[in-house]
């Protein structure tokens, strides 16, 4: 939508970043006390330090990312599917966090696997199997590429689910990683670069709330 109002992609990127940051920061402040609170995890290092802190911040910043992304990138079926999958992944973690009894790990893992499969099939359907790396370009077999995507997404969703206290670390690394790809491949990424900038804006707003002494956690969302 904003691309229709401004013909300059850099202006759209800047607006997307500012909107994502401001909206996430505002919603974090408004809904902080309405989120479920962490009980700490006995098997996590210093897990008791998280006890009593608001958790499920992903519910806020993922919805902010979804709203801003749909406003600043062209309206295409591929992007809508990714947005729905992002929200679905967040909701599965949020309902797990909010439940009085934590979900069975197989239930959460299966939901995440379905999301990863749909995301992989969607990406390959719209982008093909060609891989570009530096000056090289080659194609992977469809099945191999799909398996790699599934493993990457499923592992990324679950890598911090069994830990406490690394929310800020994972968000910081995500900002650095996404920013590095933007610097290296910004032109080639096209609309993905705008969505990535929105992600960075929302994550930086979350990190403001997560800075020591942190009061807001992502946990499984």
Enumerate the predicted regions with their spans:
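"…together with the soluble PPM/PP2C metallo-phosphatase catalytic core" -> "…together
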Residues: 1-221
